[in-house]
Amino acid sequence: MPATAPTWDPAQYLRHAGHRARPFTDLLARIPDLPADPPRIADLGCGPGNVTVLLADRWPTARITGYDNSPRMLERARQYAGPTSGGGHLDFAPADARSWTPDEPCDLLVSNATLQWVPGHADLFPGWIDRLAPGGTLALQVPGNFDAPSHRLMRELADSRRWRERLAGVLRHDDAVLTPEGYLAHLTAAGCTADVWETTYVHLLPGDDAVLDWVRGTGLRPVLDALDGDPAARDAFVDEYRAVLRAAYPAQAHGTPFPFRRVFAVARKPEGSGGSGGSGGSAGSAGCAGSGGSVGPAGEAGR
């Protein structure tokens, strides 16, 4: 795990917005009814906000706050801020997932393709669950493709003789996320009922070097950051990586197939549970306010 999370390019990230949004819609479909109306919802690691708005479609009266610690992502997301068509409200605020804690109870805390950037994130679950309202839900999705060629070849290249010294410790490894069984164990130990599953999507990506174009927006960001001051070296790494990706993911007549495994969890806090949760709160609240809200190392929006 890099010492600082990577910087983000919203335009590059959104080049595959439809494919990246599909896991979020699948996660959304498995979230049960929320205990309050209007519900209070926090989206931790909201990125450019394009999927945060889907929460308002599901819960039109909700007061929703999207959190991220990338200023560029938040700037893009704020185009969606304001009253929603169902009478709710959507806003965005800076926060770092490693230190964020809700200041008021949430009915739903959702985190989509963010927690892989947060070492030891499962240790944060008890505190988050404690701040859920009784009957509230913690829902998350993380990429589970760290053993796929896209990531394995990147790590192997970064660890090669040419690049090892410059890129040591930059890339995440397969321990960045837990197994489905691991998430189930943590969430049930925190007192929740949990629905945990995995899905492998086979995206058909258009264009030349499509897998490279995908990872430029996400997994490759730490390498691009590390070599940012040396454009020649950065381009040389990308050229080497492009060559091995072409062999691993050959283009076909209608695009490049790109299998991508993801892990999901939906954990519901019991209705009668204790802790700090509750369904009170002022109607003017824009969502689950959070402490630890200063902008940290840019980029909780990794997908």
Swiss-Prot record:
Subcellular location: Cytoplasm
Pfam families xref list: Methyltransf_25
GO cellular component annotations of the record: cytoplasm
Keywords annotated in UniProt: Cytoplasm, Methyltransferase, S-adenosyl-L-methionine, Transferase
Region (Disordered): 271-303
Reactions the enzyme catalyzes: trans-aconitate + S-adenosyl-L-methionine = (E)-3-(methoxycarbonyl)pent-2-enedioate + S-adenosyl-L-homocysteine
Record EC number: 2.1.1.144
Function per UniProt: Catalyzes the S-adenosylmethionine monomethyl esterification of trans-aconitate.
Recorded family membership: Belongs to the methyltransferase superfamily. Tam family.
Protein name, UniProt field: Trans-aconitate 2-methyltransferase
Organism: Streptomyces coelicolor (strain ATCC BAA-471 / A3(2) / M145)
